Amino acid sequence: MSQQVIIFDTTLRDGEQALQASLSVKEKLQIALALERMGVDVMEVGFPVSSPGDFESVQTIARQVKNSRVCALARCVEKDIDVAAESLKVAEAFRIHTFIATSPMHIATKLRSTLDEVIERAIYMVKRARNYTDDVEFSCEDAGRTPIADLARVVEAAINAGATTINIPDTVGYTMPFEFAGIISGLYERVPNIDKAIISVHTHDDLGLAVGNSLAAVHAGARQVEGAMNGIGERAGNCSLEEVIMAIKVRKDILNVHTAINHQEIWRTSQLVSQICNMPIPANKAIVGSGAFAHSSGIHQDGVLKNRENYEIMTPESIGLNQIQLNLTSRSGRAAVKHRMDEMGYKESEYNLDNLYDAFLKLADKKGQVFDYDLEALAFIGKQQEEPEHFRLDYFSVQSSSNDIATAAVKLACGEEVKAEAANGNGPVDAVYQAINRITDYNVELVKYSLTAKGHGKDALGQVDIVANYNGRRFHGVGLATDIVESSAKAMVHVLNNIWRAAEVEKELQRKAQHNENNKETV
C-alpha cells in the first residue's frame, strides 16, 4: 500500500536566507497562503528569536494559516524554544523544530563540546519543546558527515526524549545519493525506537544532488522531505520541492509513495515565489522553467503531435500551467475580467477587482489586447501595492539623446504634500532616480536592477525589480508598465514606501515594548 510522504516547506525560513532583501510580513504571508493552497503539510516560516520582525512574521502567519501546520526554528537553546512557542501559540496546530550539530567537525570546532554533551543538550531541549506541543522535530545538523554509530545514538536519545520527527540534513550538500540512502537504511537498522518517529531529510544542492538525495532517502524509508519552492536557499540552494513532488507523482511505480499536494497549484506558487523573492526561474529549470514543456527539435515536435507521451512524461496541465492564452480588450467588462481570473484559479480574496479592472482598462487602451500573463502581472503588482502608501509617483518626464546627459523632472506625492525636482543622470533611469533622491533626502543606493518582459512583442509589460540599500538594510521594489522608465520609477517609489513602512513598524514595536515595560513596572 502506498504511504504518504510529508512535504515540509522551508521557503520562508531557509529559502529566504538567499535573498538580497528581506521579505516584508505581507510578502511572507502572501507566500504562506499560496503554500497552504498548494497543500504543503508543514511550513517552516521563520526563526523567531532572531529579530522582532521575524517573530511578528511567524505570529502573523500562525494566526492566518489554517490547513497547514506552521513551524518555527529554534536552536537547542532555552530562549530560542520559549520564543518560538510564544510566536506559534496563536496557531491551530504548530511544530517546534530544534537542532544541534552532530558531526565531529562541528562538535569540535563550532560547539567546542563532546558528543555526550550534545546528546544531553538535545534530550533537555526536546523535552522543553514538548512542554509546549506534542509535535517536535529534532535535526542533527551536518548529519551527512556524522558517523552512523554517533548519529544513531543521537537519534535514539531524541526519540526517547519525545521528538516525533527526526530530520537528517545533508547540510553542506556533500553526500552522494547512494551514501544518503545508506544513512537512512543504517538508522532503520541501528535505532530500536525508530518506529516512534517520522524520518525526515533536508538536502542542499552544492553538488547538484539535493533532489536525487531526497528521492534516494524516500526510497530507503524517509517519509518527510524538506525543501523550498524553486530550490531557493543558501549557497546553491535547497532541495527543489516541485521537482521532488512531481518525481514522486510520475515515478509512483518505483517509489510506491504519494503526497497530499494539489499539483494544479505548483506552477502558480512557483511563479509567485519567483516574483516576490526577485529570483527569476531559469528557462531550463525542471518542472517550472519556461522551456520545461517546449519542443524545438523537428523529430520531437512530430512525435509530440502524434502522441504527447512520446516526449512528455507529464503535461503542463498537471502542474496548473494552462497553455491556452485568451485575450481581452478595452471593450471587455468587469465580469469578463473576473471570469478569466476565476478560470485561471484566482480567488476574489487574492486581488482587488476594482483596482485590477482599472489597471486592465489603462493597459488595454495602450496595447489593445490584454492576455492572461498581463492579468497575472497586474494582479501581482496590485497585491504588492495594497498597503498604505506615503509616496506616490504623480508625474515624470525625461529628455535624453545618444550624445547628451539625460534630464528628468519628477513630481512625487509625499503624504499630503506634492514635491517636484529635476536632475541629470547617466541615462533616463538614473536621472529619474537622482530626482527622486533629491525629493526624499533618503539617499538610497541602488544595489541591483533587473528587467523582465511579461508577455511577448514590443508592447509587452516590463517588470522592473530593484534592490536598494538604505541605512545598512536592503529593500526590494517592483514596478510594472509598458514604458521601462515608468516601471523603473514605480519600482523606486515602491522601495521608498517599503522603507517608510519598515520605519513605522519599528516605531510600533518600540511602542509595544515600552508599553510592556511600563506594565511590568506597574505590577
Swiss-Prot record:
Cofactor(s) the record lists: Mn(2+)
E.C. number: 2.3.3.13
Location (main, coarse): cytoplasm
Region described as Regulatory domain: spans on this chain: 392-523
Molecular function as annotated in GO: 2-isopropylmalate synthase activity; acetyl-CoA C-acetyltransferase activity; manganese ion binding
Location within or outside the cell: Cytoplasm
Binding site for Mn(2+): 14, 202, 204, 238
Gene Ontology CC annotations of this record: cytosol
Keyword Cytoplasm included in the entry's annotation: yes
PROSITE patterns documented for this protein: AIPM_HOMOCIT_SYNTH_1, AIPM_HOMOCIT_SYNTH_2, PYR_CT
Keywords: Amino-acid biosynthesis, Branched-chain amino acid biosynthesis, Cytoplasm, Leucine biosynthesis, Manganese, Metal-binding, Transferase
SMART domains found in the cross-reference section: LeuA_dimer
Main enzyme class: transferase
Entry's Gene Ontology BP terms: L-leucine biosynthetic process
Domain Pyruvate carboxyltransferase: 5-267
Pathway assigned in UniProt: Amino-acid biosynthesis; L-leucine biosynthesis; L-leucine from 3-methyl-2-oxobutanoate: step 1/4
The reaction(s) this protein catalyses: 3-methyl-2-oxobutanoate + acetyl-CoA + H2O = (2S)-2-isopropylmalate + CoA + H(+)
Subunit structure of this chain's protein: Homodimer.
Function of the molecule: Catalyzes the condensation of the acetyl group of acetyl-CoA with 3-methyl-2-oxobutanoate (2-ketoisovalerate) to form 3-carboxy-3-hydroxy-4-methylpentanoate (2-isopropylmalate).
Similarity field: Belongs to the alpha-IPM synthase/homocitrate synthase family. LeuA type 1 subfamily.
Protein name: 2-isopropylmalate synthase
Annotated organism of origin: Shigella dysenteriae serotype 1 (strain Sd197)
Gene: leuA
